[in-house]
């Protein structure tokens, strides 16, 4: 089974830019690239920061664009989103407490989409109501589960990013840790960085966004880093007993070579010339 993971698309008004890049144009590039190479994906998930300022017009445009897209797409919200504006356009994605949380079953397992947004702060929260929802979902089904969320649920050891991580990380990790045998993977966004690790013993990964990129600048302790690294999305393959995660840099414009020999048993300088 194949799944596509996008994050941090940061939609703006048409023609507006962030860091000299056009978020709408780059999101369109990501959609086209993904459909060209991965039209057989079972699901696409976008893990938050759908709009840069939570503007209603961004969500309206996104709804229209995704309604036209041939692959099924599910959404999480992030710190740049406004829950009320989002739910006015996507009302079917609210849980019983008014948070943007839900379920989608796939061949690889049951996907749970989590809402870690908190108004007017870039840090994430996961309150008692949301923890209760997640506990109930994990308890009512045998799994396996795939968790999708915006904020990083563990430290990344870059001080500016960790100030805006999921602040309720301890109760969150305790909860998922109790169910770790049923959870295959945790996918998140927020940092605009390729990241891999574990959450309470559960494999976790993140990636760059589809517009602007960060950089792991460990010497910077106050401000978030920004770079001109290529835009990216994720391609995830699931087998019975493995998960493989790729970050595809669709924004890379340089040459790509093929090399080596189709006969991979050949072991000589001539056929292996590069």
Residue spans for each PLM region:
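Beta-strand-turn-beta hairpins that frame and shape the catalytic cleft
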Residues: 1-5, 103-113, 138-146, 199-204, ...
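N-terminal active-site segment of His-dependent metallophosphoesterases
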Residues: 1-61, 139-140, 156
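Metal-dependent catalytic neighborhoods of phosphoester/phosphodiester hydrolases
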Residues: 17, 46-67, 82-95, 158-163, ...
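Binuclear metal-dependent phosphoesterase catalytic core
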Residues: 21-24, 175, 195-274
């Amino acid at each position: 089974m194949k799944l596509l993971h996008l994050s941090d698309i940061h939609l703006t008004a048409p023609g507006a830019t962030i860091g000299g890049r056009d978020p709408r144009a780059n999101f369109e590039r990501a959609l086209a690239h993904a459909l060209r190479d991965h039209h057989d994906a079972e699901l696409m998930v976008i893990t938050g920061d759908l709009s840069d300022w939570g503007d209603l017009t961004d969500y309206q445009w996104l709804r229209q664009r995704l309604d036209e897209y041939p692959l099924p797409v599910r959404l999480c919200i992030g710190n740049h989103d406004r829950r009320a504006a989002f739910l006015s356009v996507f009302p079917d994605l609210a849980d019983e407490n008014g948070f943007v949380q839900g379920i989608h079953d796939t061949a690889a397992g049951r996907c749970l989409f989590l809402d870690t947004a908190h108004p007017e702060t870039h840090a994430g929260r996961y309150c008692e109501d949301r923890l209760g929802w997640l506990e109930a979902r994990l308890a009512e089904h045998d799994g396996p589960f795939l968790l999708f969320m915006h904020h990083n649920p563990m430290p990344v050891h870059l001080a500016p990013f960790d100030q805006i991580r999921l602040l309720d990380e301890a109760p969150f990790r305790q909860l998922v840790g109790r169910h770790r045998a049923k959870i295959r993977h945790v996918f998140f966004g927020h940092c605009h960085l390729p990241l891999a690790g574990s959450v309470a013993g559960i494999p976790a990964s993140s990636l760059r966004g589809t517009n602007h990129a960060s950089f792991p600048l460990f010497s910077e302790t106050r401000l978030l880093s920004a770079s001109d690294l290529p835009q990216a999305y994720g391609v995830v393959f699931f087998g019975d007993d493995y998960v493989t995660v790729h970050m595809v840099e669709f924004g890379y414009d340089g040459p790509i070579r093929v090399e080596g020999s189709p006969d991979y048993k050949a072991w000589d300088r001539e056929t292996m010339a590069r």
